[in-house]
Amino acid sequence: MHPPAVSLTRFLRHSIAALLLTLAGNCGIVQAQQKTAPAQEKPKIRAITAFINLDRAQYQQQVADALKMLKRAQTVFESRGYEVQTIRISTQPFPEYTKGLTKEQAVEFFKQYDALAAKEKFAAAIGPAMLNAGDSEAQADLLAEILGNTKTLNASLVVAGEDGVHWAAVGAAARVMKKLEESTPHSQGNFSFSAIAMVPPLTPFYPGSYHTGFGHQFTIALESANVVAAAFKGAPDLSTAKQRLTDSLAASAFDIERLAGRVDQDTGWAYMGIDLSPAPLKDVSIGAAIENLTTQPFGTSGTLTAAATITAAIKDVKVKQAGYSGLMLPILEDSRLAQRWSEGRISIDALLSYSAVCGTGLDTVPLPGDITAEQLSLIIGDMASLAYKWHKPLSARLLPALGKGWGEMTEFDNSFLVNATLQPLDRK
């Protein structure tokens, strides 16, 4: 038996009206969420880093092959709206491919490699001078000569590994820092050098980047302090802030990983992961992002909790992670951090305490020029001990400024650095 036409018409009219009311209600919910949720920020790609097993007899062809992949990757990422800031090539530890050379011959080779990097517009890392405990300290002395005579090269010393702190390397790293302070313009050679502890191979960030395998691999580094700032702005509590940050980073990281997989398939270079550390750059400030959450100046109570929140959010992003993948606090690469350092709100001990819950240690920290190698080794040793104790990647990139004392302003002439007022080593 069929329902009367009038009843059917009334039924349809009521059903359509109910559907319209439901849609209108849902529309209101969506609009409300759009008002409360932070706008989606897109990170930049700080670096696409290729890893090669450098052979002096054919390094030019190896570099050409790596650049072909890097430029293909750059095109892929830029087509999706990601700004790629640098392309980079890192090698195995340089003592492995300079065996048999005199100091003068090694320096001359790296001058040629430096010129190639400048010509082809890629950043270059030549790996650690000392990788294992017991490695020759003469290689650290050679490294100081290499960095003092080149402009684009980056390198490191490993001062802690699975076997503990490498105390000879700690002292050697301090001597390299003093040599670079005294022998490079504006003492800027130390910007390209770091003492690294528990830092795994294949990190894309410089200067501690290296590998120990066959190469033909690549990783990606982000510049995403803007993503942190947007996620934290107006967050009502830590839990919300953390979830917002995880979701925001994941949205881009999944997309970047998918694109990296395409590069892997297209080129045959193996994609080894992404370093999600939210690197800042001057006014794109991680310090300001943290202040969005704490509503207090960086360095006051609550800063450590914010640092832990960022690191926890990063660890929850389910992509293939590489390198540090933790919070970076590079004092002179971040305008707000440089300001708070100048105000005396941040100290080396405070940075080490934050490193206990995040990373990456002591990065671009300005120091008075009269600091001794012994004092530098104590600072590096503290960082290395912390890294080994908690089995986490940390580094020390310390920037003593020749001829400058506490209370004076640094005069670094580098587009990546912000100058700041030097603070005393021991604050009372």
Located regions from the model:
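Bacterial N-terminal signal peptides that target proteins for export
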Residues: 1-16
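Sec/Tat signal peptide C-region and signal peptidase I cleavage site
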Residues: 28-31
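Anaerobic metallocofactor- and corrinoid-dependent redox/one-carbon enzyme cores
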Residues: 33-428
